[in-house]
Amino acid sequence: MYEETQMEKTFRKLKRLEEMLHDRMFVPVDQVEMSVWTTKKLVHEVPERGLFGPCERGRKWLEEGLYCWFLGDYTIPEKLAGQTLFIFPKIKGYEGMLWVDKKPYGNFTSKVIQNSYGYHYCDLLTKGKAAGEQLEIALEYYSHHYVRGTQPFEESDEVFEIAYDHVDICVKDEIVCNFFYDLHIVNQMAESLSKEQFRRGDAVRALLRVHEIIDYDIDLADPVEWHEKAQKADAVLQEVLSDHNGPHAGFAGLIGHSHMDTAWLWHVGETIKKCART
């Protein structure tokens, strides 16, 4: 039996757990060495290899309107053969674009921070490649530019920076991912639904049960035992989420979209690149 104050503390712990899970969804298993080339020109394909030079960890560029291109080759090792691999650049920049074997492949946005990283921070690299197969990986990052404000006395304090640390190759921890998204939804149910609603009661009971099952100290826990507990806790959440409305309930649908704030945020050349990233 939990009283209200104790339940609120428990809910805060579960929100903190959600944040910890977010940072563990992708597990680094390898790295790829990169070389670098910088330009202010609008380049619409991967530059020639001869333009690139060494790129040291910790290097920074502080310049408005700058594009940093990073280039590297990655050979699938035996230990990762046949697996689905992701690329996680530890590169600070306004926006970035991924090219694989000279083809546009994904984007990165660190301009808006969600938890520790941007909205798009870890992209799919390949599925099921055999050991020994090689990929050419290129990353184009943009430092951004000054955008005129709508207020007469507005001044820009933006720092136009690109900072390179390293580039990780990752695998997805499916158990952690499933647990994270289910916990995120049930946490929202407990926060948003009225206390008089039965559905909120179901969500609260599930969260309290998760609190009893899970080990919060992920780093010190035995990995195998922790994942077993996570699966057990996730099963409790999935039971709540499997309870759907009846056929006569209202319907809610989701529609995704992308839009371009052209004309006033970017010049035409950067808008073309922006469309490609999107």
Ranges and model annotations:
Residues 1-278:
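Carbohydrate-active enzymes and regulators
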